[in-house]
Amino acid sequence: MTDKVQTTLLFLAIGEFSVGILGNAFIGLVNCMDWVKKRKIASIDLILTSLAISRICLLCVILLDCFMLVLYPDVYATGKQMRIIDFFWTLTNHLSIWFATCLSIYYFFKIANFFHPLFLWMKWRIDRVISWILLGCMVLSVFINLPATENLNADFRRCVKAKRKTNLTWSCRVTKAQHASTKLFLNLVTLLPFSVCLVSFFLLILSLWRHIRRMQLSATGCRDPSTEAHVRALKAVISFLFLFIAYYLSFLIATSSYFIPETELAVIFGEFIALIYPSSHSFILILGNNKLRRASLKVLWTVMSILKGRKFQQKQI
């Protein structure tokens, strides 16, 4: 029964992976084509492209981890494959979260309306410093992940290679507890960008509320371009927050799996939930971006035209 459940979850994970690759590859392709055409890239497109690339890598690592757990559990647990997968998963995970946070920060500074001197200074300079912020996120992720992942894998390898039968169970329990605590630490580090995103969300709500009040007092209505921009930004940020919470819960499931009998099943179930975040958020970003939305509608119209043309040819035959 467990094997059937694992296989079912694996096939569902493949479906989520395919959807996520489709959405993120579309974002990256549209922005890169626009970059080549105009020979420059807007700040928002740079953030979205970086986010899409990091999520494509994250999806590939998660799916590879699922395959290794189901098909080659012994090789995965004892070889350096686990070390490599854990490192790249943690790295791409942190990059994806930090880039999504950069997107929330960018929305906040470009759309919100406050009159504090520091806010106005940052609003004026955000386009100039966003590339450096993205680079800083990459460097920070590498420096956090390298030592933590090495400790994580060293603890687990000691558990796997333990050969003293009298102390084997106790040794594994201790090292697995250390392994889980290291993973928990890596997950807690992601609470920093989550908190930044949460602050941006509440400040955007405050800015929207103040803007609507001004519109009502001036009797000009509430559905002006600034209000629409606020609403679109809030939808993108709140979707990230909800999906990130589900993503974080999936890591807690995977971490707690070391203390329950069906470890592999719990890990695969956690990874199945984890795939929802990078897969679905890309389509929310596409719908919230005018250029990406127009490009997606154009692609859908082209596909529909091709399908209708084939049906017409088949009827003639």
From Swiss-Prot:
Pfam families, per database record: TAS2R (PF05296)
Which residue ranges traverse the bilayer?
10-30, 56-76, 95-115, 129-149, 188-208, 236-256, 267-287
All ranges on the Cytoplasmic side of the membrane: 31-55, 116-128, 209-235, 288-317
Glycosylation sites recorded in the entry for this protein: 167
Q: A GO CC term?
A: plasma membrane
Disulfide bridge positions per record:
none
What InterPro entries does its record include? GPCR_Rhodpsn_7TM, TAS2R
Membrane topology (Extracellular): 1-9, 77-94, 150-187, 257-266
Q: Where is it predominantly found?
A: membrane
Where in the cell? Answer: Membrane
What topology does it adopt in the membrane? Answer: Multi-pass membrane protein
Q: Name one GO molecular function term.
A: G protein-coupled receptor activity
UniProt similarity note: Belongs to the G-protein coupled receptor T2R family.
Q: What functional role does this protein have?
A: Gustducin-coupled receptor implicated in the perception of bitter compounds in the oral cavity and the gastrointestinal tract. Signals through PLCB2 and the calcium-regulated cation channel TRPM5.
Q: What is this protein called?
A: Taste receptor type 2 member 7
> Which species does this protein come from?
Papio hamadryas (Hamadryas baboon)
What lineage is on file? Eukaryota, Metazoa, Chordata, Craniata, Vertebrata
Gene (name only): TAS2R7
